[in-house]
């Protein structure tokens, strides 16, 4: 049995992304259902903790993905970018990573500021309606991330190339 540790770490990275997304979906639902503003602030802190793993997991997937491409196309007569499924996968990963590393922190920070103002009573008149819009944006963000992850998984499973070092 031959295998690549690089491929194994890539699978671990994919599992971490899946775990972070699942945890964020679960915590998002809990945040929306909670009525106490203090508990909502606490739950938001938990979400921030999970969000801190995002850059680490992105680096793991980026480095191991580059390693997998190198292993797969080392000595091949054609370059990797001639494979449409692989180019699509790289583009989807770039969109997902940018979305997760840029959009998510901005959205979470704005939402927590609104919840904090509602918690301490310094909120203006339209804050709750703004918070509802932000909650909808957060749900849409998670839906887009899940769809991107499933698209990447689909391309990995049904793409024309085989990953190096399949166990």
Summary of predicted features, one role per range:
Residues 1-167:
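Polytopic transmembrane helical bundles with strong interfacial aromatic enrichment
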């Amino acid at each position: 049995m031959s295998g690549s540790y690089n491929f194994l770490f890539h699978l671990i990275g994919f599992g971490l992304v899946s775990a972070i997304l699942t945890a964020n979906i679960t915590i998002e639902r809990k945040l929306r259902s909670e009525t106490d503003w203090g508990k909502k602030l606490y739950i938001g802190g938990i979400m921030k903790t999970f969000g801190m793993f995002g850059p680490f997991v992105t680096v793991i997937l980026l480095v191991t993905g580059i390693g997998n491409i190198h292993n797969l196309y080392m000595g091949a007569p054609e370059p990797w970018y001639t494979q449409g499924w692989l180019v699509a996968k790289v583009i989807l990963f770039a969109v997902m990573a940018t979305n997760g590393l840029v959009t998510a922190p901005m959205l979470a920070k704005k939402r927590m500021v609104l919840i904090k103002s509602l918690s301490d009573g310094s909120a203006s008149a339209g804050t709750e309606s703004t918070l509802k819009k932000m909650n909808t944006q957060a749900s849409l963000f998670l839906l887009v991330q899940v769809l991107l992850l499933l698209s990447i998984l689909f391309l990995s499973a049904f793409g024309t190339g085989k990953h190096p070092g399949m166990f």
